[in-house]
Design a protein with these regions (language model features):
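Hydrophobic or amphipathic alpha-helical targeting/insertion segments
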Residues: 29-77
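Glycine-rich loop at the start of a catalytic domain that most often binds anionic cofactors/ligands
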Residues: 24-39, 167-171, 313-323
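Noncatalytic, beta-rich nucleic-acid-contacting surfaces in large DNA/RNA-processing enzymes
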Residues: 2, 14-18, 161, 237-913
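Histidine/acidic-residue-rich catalytic or RNA/ligand-binding cores of hydrolases
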Residues: 51, 137-139, 163-173, 313
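Structural signature of the thiamine diphosphate
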Residues: 206-232, 376
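Phosphate/diphosphate-binding loops
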Residues: 42-45, 53, 161-166, 174-216, ...
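Domain-core and long-helix interface of multi-subunit machines
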Residues: 1-18, 22-37, 72-164, 255-284
């Protein structure tokens, strides 16, 4: 759209209108770009009636809200029954004869149709579309009708692309959307952006004048606040309630509430929150988190900058006390910016929808919505889409896709920077043709989706002020997140975190064993936990699973919680270059230096290295005398490379430092050092929160490994978790036995029995949870006496020959002490026997009576171990009976050898043999 708006500006147009098909998807970007190019924008929507297409334009705010209603009505298929209030001056209607079948009917019927549907609108036009290839006869007919029935005509070309040869782009995009194919690769179309001279040639003077009249009549401003912060439902003022709950909450925390530092910090934060009008926001978030905890839903310790707030800690929104970690409130809520703070919340992923449902019930369905996202066509997708639309050879498509690597570069940059891609383009004509076509569609929106975490809440029904659309059963906004926030709608991120589900499952396993564990009370400086981390046994640990992170743990010889916080901040492209220096300084192998001695208290915890954004803020406060609010503005400006703001704040920093007695050249040196690290600074609040979550998982793994691994494996079952083999390798290293499924202990999850992990029956292909639950009921009547007893008792459950075959191959029947080959050879006879014997089953107990038909003998066969393992792998996706690699072990304190999956990051794997 940017290119099109730029072209409109270049051709001398002062006003442009936009109308999407029954939606308002493009409005925010359109309004933003026209404002940027100083062009007046007119907001509209195309509405399809059974026999006509009408474009409605918003004259004012009320008109815009009518467009929102029209979008909703059209999506519901109710537009034919909709009537406008008499003398409606809030919207303008333009009927498009060229795209309306009603214009083929007699004038009197046409006039009646328009009058029926549009009579309430004060100003209705007949839109004249005249393109280079248009037939003049129908256009003249439209003008005659308009004149006869007193409808003004207006120049109304539907512009679909910038230049005539761009018509093929539209065709390709439509073919992608419809799943169709094309043969033509070039096309000239008439719905391009005409010059002003072409407009004058194609339309009557009065029709051009009417475009000016519409422009003058439409004075709607898109850039106003329409969202209203939801009021927390209570019988007292939100400010009073927030203060009361904060004081009560802090008193219940394991801290000395009488300390002046806590009292002053709490009062300061509450005052800022009250002044900025955010009390309701905090109460709303605290309420649904409290609900989650009451429902025993696992809640994360915090995320983002919210752990920097003592109020958030007091309300139970976070589990991080900001004072001992030197976390800053202003990093979370800067009073000088007056923008809504972000309180992102993590819940066990399996329960995320329960939280959203609670919010819907509490505040009303019409006040809550999911948020739309738009996916654009990136380089690899463009190649694949062109390949499908034009049926190019799969060989060429795969060659180009592979040459694009991770696909992060656009096609033009890929040609310049990726030799293999350039070679295919230069030497293969088909590849060159694919790339040229792909380049045409690159960057266009391909499809919409739903934001993974965000929802919006509003005081009034959303459909009154915001266009919505249904995506399956869910209602989502038509505007993306950044535009919603700009319009004042409250966004809350409710994230589902698999790691919280793992922790919750692990704690439940421990509860079943009679072990009650409260993670809030575990010691945070446990040597055994750090010993585990140093060994590199980090599979399943949040943030720590990569081989690079394992090496980093060994490099710094992690032995304290602050190391973990630092590593989570450092282990990113750029900052990770400092890991070696951090390790050497910590171990006394490199001198610890500071930018200035007065900055030692700030930089000492990180051995003189700037790691956190909060440190930049504290340096600005200490050296230049900035308030923390101004220091946060300083941090934001340099991290976002906001040159204009940076220039002013740089001078302010230097002046402030000089006024505090620092030499100007020294102050400049510190400023330049900050500038160097600004790109790499990490949010310490987020790092502390996620380090806490990571440490909790490490604690469980250290002291309750069987329950931990059971939880990890349960979370991986049925997924494409590529780390599964890594989990199993660690189990062998720790001498924790992972056993095949066992028909005597049928389960839908990995279970712990005698310090062994037993795989669930649902691990098998074709064995569904419902069937396992029925097997459990049979097993509760008594143990299976032998193979024949088992097959007979399961016969009424419709456990098929294939089911039994899979159970044999998985090792579920190994408990009967017979070779798997024998069980396979005897299965047919067992099924025949079961068909007869099952008629004798006791209806009450489900057991065979002591006297029944004689058992038939087993058909003995010799096991072939590798065949067994092959079949086991086929039905379960893993080998549980024994390790194929035998006695291989990675040295406990040796170098970390990456898996092939990890090595794919460098596209290099070295093998020996």
């Amino acid at each position: 759209m940017d290119r099109l708006i730029s072209a409109i500006k270049e051709k001398g147009y002062s006003t442009v209108g936009l109308a999407d098909h029954q939606v308002l998807f493009g409005v925010p970007e359109f309004a933003t770009l026209t404002k940027k190019h100083q062009i007046q924008s007119i907001i509209g929507i195309d509405i399809v009636y059974p026999k006509m297409l009408v474009t409605f334009f918003a004259v004012n705010e009320l008109g815009y809200r009518e467009l929102i209603q029209l979008s909703h009505i059209a999506q519901e298929g109710l537009i034919s029954n909709h009537r406008f209030q008499s003398k409606n001056k809030n919207i303008i209607a333009v009927v498009s004869p060229l795209q309306s079948s009603i214009f083929k009917e007699p004038f009197d019927q046409l006039a009646l149709y328009l009058n029926t549907h549009l009579s309430g609108i004060a100003l209705t036009y007949v839109g004249i579309e005249n393109y280079p290839d248009s037939d003049e006869k129908p256009i003249q007919l439209y003008r005659e009708f308009a004149k006869k029935y007193s409808y003004p005509t207006v120049a109304f070309p539907h512009i679909r692309y910038g230049k005539p040869n761009d018509a093929i782009i539209l065709d390709i995009l439509q073919a992608i959307h419809r799943g169709e194919t094309l043969t033509i690769k070039e096309k000239l179309g008439g719905q391009y952006l005409p010059t002003l001279e072409e407009i004058q040639q194609r339309y009557l003077p009065e029709e051009i004048i009417e475009t000016t009249n519409i422009a003058n009549g439409c004075r709607f401003n898109f850039f106003v606040k329409r969202g209203q912060l939801l009021s927390f439902q209570s019988g007292t003022s939100s400010q009073d309630l927030l203060r009361e709950k904060s004081i009560e909450g802090l008193q219940s925390r394991p801290i000395d509430f009488t300390q002046m530092a806590y009292l002053e910090r709490l009062d300061y934060e509450l005052t800022m929150i009250e002044q900025l009008g955010f009390a309701d926001y905090f109460l709303i978030v605290a309420d649904f988190i409290q609900y989650a905890k009451q429902q025993r839903i696992m809640v994360g310790p915090g995320r983002g900058s919210a752990p920097g707030s003592l109020v958030a800690y007091a309300l139970g929104i976070t589990e991080i006390d900001p004072l001992p970690h030197q976390l800053l409130f202003e990093r979370f809520l800067n009073p000088s910016r007056k923008t809504m703070p972000d309180i992102d919340t993590d819940f066990a992923d399996k329960d995320r929808e329960k939280i959203i449902e609670y919010i819907r019930k509490k505040y009303g369905d019409d006040r809550v919505s999911h948020i739309i996202t738009y996916q654009t066509i990136q380089a690899k997708q463009a190649i694949r889409d062109i390949g499908r639309v034009y049926k190019f050879s799969n060989t060429s498509i795969e060659l180009l896709s592979k040459a694009l690597g991770d696909g992060k570069l656009d096609l033009r940059s890929s040609y310049k920077k990726l030799p293999a891609f350039q070679k295919h383009f230069d030497e293969d004509p088909e590849c060159a043709e694919i790339v040229k076509l792909a380049h045409k569609i690159e960057g266009f929106i391909r499809q919409s989706g739903m934001h993974a975490a965000g929802i919006i809440l509003n005081e009034t029904p959303l459909h009154q002020s915001l266009p919505l659309i249904k995506q399956g059963p869910k209602v989502i906004t038509q505007y993306e997140m950044n535009h919603l926030e700009a319009q004042g709608f409250l966004k809350i991120d409710i994230l589902g975190l698999r790691n919280l589900t793992i922790i919750e499952t692990c704690l439940n396993q421990l509860n079943h064993q009679g072990i009650q564990l409260d993670l809030k009370t575990i010691p945070m400086e446990d040597n055994q936990v750090f010993q585990l981390l140093r060994t590199g046994l980090n599979m399943g640990l949040f943030q720590l699973e990569s081989d690079g992170m394992k090496r980093a743990m060994k490099t710094i010889q992690i032995d304290r919680f602050s190391d973990l916080v630092s590593l989570i901040a450092l282990y990113r492209p750029g900052p990770m270059d400092n890991i070696e220096s951090y390790a050497r300084r910590k171990q006394g192998l490199e001198p610890v230096t500071y930018l200035d001695n007065q900055l030692k208290p700030i930089l000492n915890p990180t051995f003189g290295i700037i790691i956190y954004q909060e440190q930049i803020m504290q340096i600005a406060q200490t050296m230049a005398g900035f308030s923390l609010a101004k220091a946060d503005d300083f941090r934001r400006a340099i991290s976002k490379k906001d040159n204009e703001t940076m220039l002013a704040l740089k001078q302010s920093f230097l002046d402030g430092a000089v006024s505090k007695g620092y030499k100007s050249d020294h102050a400049l040196s510190v400023y330049n050092h900050i500038l160097k690290f600004a790109d790499y600074g990490f949010n310490k609040s987020h790092s502390v929160a996620y380090a806490t979550l990571t440490y909790q998982m490490a604690y469980l793994k250290t002291y309750h490994p069987d329950a931990f691994y059971a939880s990890i494996l349960n979370s991986s079952a049925g997924t494409s978790d590529t780390k599964l083999m890594g989990y199993m390798d660690e189990l062998r290293t720790l001498k924790i036995k992972l056993m095949p499924p066992n028909i005597q202990t049928p389960s839908t999850q990995f279970i712990i029995q005698d310090h062994q992990l037993i795989a669930p029956l649902t691990l098998l292909k074709g064995i569904h949870p419902e069937l396992v639950l029925r097997i459990q009921k049979v097993r509760l009547q008594g143990p299976f006496a032998d193979f024949f007893d088992c097959v007979t008792r399961l016969y009424p459950l419709d456990v098929t020959l294939q089911h039994h075959s899979s159970l044999i191959d998985a090792g579920a029947y190994d408990v009967f002490g017979l070779p798997r080959a024998t069980l396979r050879a005897s299965l047919q006879n067992a099924m025949k026997n079961a068909a007869i014997q099952s008629t004798f089953l006791d209806e009450q107990t489900g057991l065979l009576p002591p006297t029944s038909l004689p058992k038939i003998p087993m058909v003995e066969a010799e096991d072939k171990p590798f065949e067994n393992l092959e079949k086991e792998l086929d039905v379960t996706g893993m080998i549980l009976s024994q390790s194929v690699l035998g006695n291989y072990r990675q040295p406990k304190n040796g170098p970390v050898i990456p898996t092939i999956q990890e090595s794919k990051r460098t596209n290099q794997v070295v093998t020996t043999g």
